[in-house]
């Protein structure tokens, strides 16, 4: 089974990333925290048998910043669409359109996620059409699919 994983992220620019933390941290500290999150999740992704993609915002941002953090061996492409749902859908549609059997899309500010969590999600996709990684607050940190589903 050909597996792909998309890291869905912003380019860590001071004042533009992790802005909800700015009452507590400086813009530079927020960008540094984001960089640390990117490195942590990238380390876990390397342990999984999947091709890794990075889907970034803003689309006119300097992708070299991300390449310096995550490495040049990944494919990078910009997020497209108006809403978060549209951007996620277009990302999954693009990567699955490259011939992958399954694809996981995940955020990057989840330091607790480990490679076994990702492997488990890929295992679920052997039996199911979709998988979600739930968060304690009722949201999700990961979505995986065999084919892009617009809903």
Where are the model-predicted features located?
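Short phosphate-binding loop-to-helix
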Residues: 66-102
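Conserved donor-nucleotide/metal-binding helix-loop-beta segment in metal-dependent transferases, i.e.
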Residues: 111-140
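N-terminal nucleotide-binding beta1-loop-alpha1 segment
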Residues: 1-20
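Short, high-confidence coil segments that cap the C-terminus of an alpha-helix
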Residues: 50, 100, 127-130
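Short beta-strand/loop segment that forms part of the nucleotide-sugar
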Residues: 50-59
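A short, N-terminal amphipathic alpha-helix
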Residues: 32-50
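Short aromatic-hydrophobic micro-motifs that form the base-stacking/packing surface
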Residues: 104-106
């Amino acid at each position: 089974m050909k597996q792909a994983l998309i890291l869905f992220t912003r380019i860590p620019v001071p004042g533009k990333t992790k802005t909800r933390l700015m009452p507590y941290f400086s813009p530079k500290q927020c960008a540094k925290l984001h960089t640390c999150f990117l490195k942590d999740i990238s380390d876990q992704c390397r342990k999984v048998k999947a091709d890794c993609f990075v889907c970034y915002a803003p689309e006119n941002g300097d992708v070299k910043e991300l390449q310096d953090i995550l490495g040049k061996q990944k494919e990078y492409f910009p997020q497209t669409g108006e809403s978060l749902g549209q951007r996620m859908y277009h990302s999954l549609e693009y990567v699955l359109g490259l011939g992958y059997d399954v694809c996981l899309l995940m955020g990057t500010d989840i330091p607790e996620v480990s490679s076994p969590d990702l492997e488990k999600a890929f295992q679920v996709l052997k039996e199911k059409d979709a998988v979600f990684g739930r968060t304690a607050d009722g949201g999700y940190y990961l979505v995986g699919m065999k084919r892009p589903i617009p809903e």
